[in-house]
């Protein structure tokens, strides 16, 4: 179980069998993201990245919400009343964990969307490698309803995962949609009944824990970078990642996998990971 009890005010961390559950913990505010939460999440992510007990990170929310987005009072009204340099600091901290750290995180990440997911919550949702949501979850880009366009990297997140028409429809109308629609749109990998959400997420996390962590990191980073590069750049970059993973992999995953398949005949790599 967790060794982090009481360390952070707005975030809880529980580690179970290699899975680090990172729980946004402001249920009375539907886990709205405040400047304090943003600062604490930077520390949480950097701490867990170095913790060998945390093999896969699952991001979820306490109570009935994943996150309602940015805390309107703390993030906007109070920050807007301060100097411009304060606004810049607060925005930088928000982007640091919601996108920069999470998107290229060293370990696999899964968004476990248990309820409300609004506005700024779309950035960390898409930054996670994989996402499972509850059928009962409610998603919405409500910024237009209170007079601003989507902030942070919400529009970029939508553009990278959801088609042009669907993105603009929800950005411009502010209408909400449920878990099944989120899965249909490709915003999440799968939508399941809330009662099954944790079980399904744990099953996925255990699948990832079976994989070689060095190679898994190279594979996910390679995919995310390749979307930004030309074909020629990708050829060089992805071969470099392949060579890098072999150098960094102390357990010799490639050699182990080849041996178990070709020599020992003990695995079927099309159906399972090699035995670590």
UniProtKB/Swiss-Prot annotation:
Optimum pH is 8.5-9.5. It catalyses: (E)-feruloyl-CoA + H2O = vanillin + acetyl-CoA; (E)-caffeoyl-CoA + H2O = 3,4-dihydroxybenzaldehyde + acetyl-CoA; (E)-4-coumaroyl-CoA + H2O = 4-hydroxybenzaldehyde + acetyl-CoA; (E)-feruloyl-CoA + H2O = 3-hydroxy-3-(4-hydroxy-3-methoxyphenyl)propanoyl-CoA. SUPFAM superfamilies: ClpP/crotonase. It is an enzyme of class 4 (lyase). Its EC number is 4.1.2.61. Transmembrane segments: none annotated. The keyword tRNA processing does not apply. Acetyl-CoA binds at residues 29, 68, 70, 72, 120, 142, 146. Coiled coil: none annotated. PANTHER family: ENOYL-COA HYDRATASE, POLYKETIDE BIOSYNTHESIS ENOYL-COA HYDRATASE PKSH-RELATED. Catalyzes the hydration of the acyl-CoA thioester of ferulic acid and the subsequent retro-aldol cleavage of the hydrated intermediate to yield vanillin (4-hydroxy-3-methoxy-benzaldehyde). The enzyme is also active with caffeoyl-CoA and 4-coumaroyl-CoA producing 3,4-dihydroxybenzaldehyde and 4-hydroxybenzaldehyde, respectively. Homohexamer; dimer of trimers. NCBIfam families: PRK09120.1. This is Hydroxycinnamoyl-CoA hydratase-lyase. It comes from Pseudomonas fluorescens.
